[in-house]
């Protein structure tokens, strides 16, 4: 599987991954700033935070809500990037017969299959984790300057990173479609649907109860794993 991941990295290139990451951060920041400017004018920031944060100063509330929305849009963008990577790596490999070339390596069909998925997770996940860690680190530092104790600490960051990992795994649902339907439209539409479902679940559970997001992630993860098993069975029977 390492060979497939190395070949996938060479096929995409570090420059393309870096450009995806920078575009994702810039887009998420712009959208978040626009949304929060309206919420701040209407003084509705506290409604998007737990009740314990209602007594915090307005600038700290702004920072917390900005962080929550920024990470939310970063996750959504990562789901879309996973869809593009799936199309670029898997569908392009089918069309250009790269799978036939890769199959000449001492690899089983199963190793080839999971090697492609591992490459997608790594290429989409590493930039997200790095960006997420930097954003959370800056937020924690900023909050320690303005408030003590900080509402978000190491435990909060660990939970956010765990949630990110589940988002990445669920994002494979759009990648699985690339093994069934070799068209960009199917892959991207499925990624957009995942974005809508998970973003709505995230915003809703911020207001009500955080357990709802875990329930949605668990259901989607189960569906993803079933699809992975089905597409693996389908892939092993294909003529490369």
Predicted features, each with a name:
Residues 17, 108-114, 182-188:
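Membrane-helix interface segments
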Residues 27-89, 114-185:
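Secretory targeting signals
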Residues 1-81, 85, 93, 179-180, ...:
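Hydrophobic alpha-helical transmembrane segments
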Residues 88-121:
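Helix-loop-helix units of permease transmembrane domains in multi-pass membrane transporters
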Residues 22, 116-117, 160, 164, ...:
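Residue-level recognition of transmembrane alpha-helices
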Residues 5, 9, 112-113, 157:
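Hydrophobic alpha-helical elements at and bordering transmembrane segments
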């Amino acid at each position: 599987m390492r060979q497939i991941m190395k070949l996938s990295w060479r096929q995409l290139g570090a420059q393309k991954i870096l450009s995806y990451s920078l575009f994702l951060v810039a887009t998420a920041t712009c959208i978040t700033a626009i949304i929060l400017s309206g919420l701040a004018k209407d003084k509705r920031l506290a409604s998007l935070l737990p009740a314990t944060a209602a007594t915090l100063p307005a600038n700290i509330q702004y920072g917390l809500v900005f962080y929550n929305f920024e990470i939310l849009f970063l996750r959504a963008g990562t789901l879309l990037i996973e869809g593009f990577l799936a199309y670029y790596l898997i569908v392009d490999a089918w069309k250009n017969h790269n799978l036939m070339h890769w199959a000449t390596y001492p690899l089983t069909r199963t190793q080839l299959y999971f090697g492609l998925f591992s490459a997608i997770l790594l290429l989409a996940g590493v930039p997200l984790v790095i960006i997420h860690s930097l954003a959370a680190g800056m937020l924690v530092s900023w909050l320690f300057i303005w408030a003590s104790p900080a509402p978000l600490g190491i435990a909060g960051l660990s939970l956010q990173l765990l949630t990110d990992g589940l988002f990445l795994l669920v994002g494979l649902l759009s990648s699985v479609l690339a093994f069934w339907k070799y068209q960009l439209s199917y892959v991207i539409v499925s990624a957009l649907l995942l974005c809508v479902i998970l973003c709505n679940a995230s915003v809703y559970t911020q207001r009500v109860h955080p357990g709802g997001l875990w329930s949605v992630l668990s259901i989607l993860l189960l569906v993803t794993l079933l699809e992975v098993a089905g597409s693996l069975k389908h892939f092993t029977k294909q003529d490369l």
